[in-house]
Amino acid sequence: MKQKLLILIVLLIGSTMCFAQPLVSYRFEERSLSLGGGYTNMLDTYLSPLKYQGAHVSVLGERFTQTQAESKRWFTQSLFYLHGDYATPRSGSGLTVSGMADYSYTSYYKVAAKGEQFRFYAGPQGQLRIGGIYNLRNSINPAQLKLGVNLAASAMIKYVFTGWHIPMNVRLQADLPLLGIAFGPNYGQSYYEIFYLGQGKGCVHMTALHNNLSLRSNFSYDIQLHPCTLRLTLANDLYQWTLGRQHYRMFSHSVMVGCVKDLYHVGREEEAKKSIPY
């Protein structure tokens, strides 16, 4: 009798789980990797009073995640942007190379959604930039370290549609730094004095809109193919500092091509695809 009762309980639990499967919650995640190149224009008065122009290559990795399985309003985004530049002045007598690594983490709230097509997101963003510039023309102080941390505001607009029976979407994202901290030597101050002699007072600066008016924007176009979604991105990055009497500005414009992969961490994939939260 007890064995029959146990079997009945197991069967009831199993049948309940089977019927409940379509209602199992899930957490959606989108990952992408893009490669590209374009044009750069930079000025760093610590190294040279001249403007340098040249080639720009970049790698962009993104992770866009739904924070909770039950929530369709809160999302997080992690962006890793690795880029390098090779530039010369207008005269052609000189060369500057640079390499930067940018990381940002954003907490997005879906402010508005019009049907299943239009979505608008906004939220705070933390930014970290580290890298360096090397001027082959200089014999004294040929290099410049770039290090900064920012609190920024980010906004994203996304429009989903179908063309030629293929799911597509366009997306525009813009990030504006508001407050931060940056490292930069003072006028005439060498890195030998800062790191070897320990005379680094005044090298850490507070930044805001008055001395760090920067903007990063990405316009992307996604075409859903198999086994992944094709992403075409137009990336623009305007970054400038005025620290003490030193001015730094870098503007880059690049075209990128990449692949997007959707992941479903919990629940059944076919059910999740029917109601992607963003």
Where do the language-model regions lie?
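Transmembrane beta-barrel strands of outer-membrane/channel proteins
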Residues: R31-N41, T76-G84, A122-G132, I157, ...
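Residues on the lipid-exposed face of transmembrane beta-strands in outer-membrane beta-barrel proteins
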Residues: V59-Q68, A101-Y109, P124, L151-Y159, ...
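Extracellular loop and loop/strand-boundary signature of outer-membrane beta-barrel proteins
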Residues: L43-Y52, D85-L95, N138-Q144, C203-T207, ...
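Short glycine/proline- and aromatic-enriched beta-strand/turn motifs that initiate or cap beta-hairpins
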Residues: A20-R73, I276-Y278
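Predominantly the C-terminal beta-signal and adjacent terminal strand-loop region
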Residues: Q173-D175, F183-P185, K201, H205, ...
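Outer-membrane beta-barrel transmembrane domain signature
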Residues: I140-P227
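Short loop/turn motifs that connect adjacent beta-strands in outer-membrane beta-barrel proteins
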Residues: P22-E29, Q66-F75, K110-F120, T162-N169, ...
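Residues that define the transmembrane beta-barrel architecture of outer-membrane proteins
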Residues: E29, K51-L60, S93-Y103, F118, ...
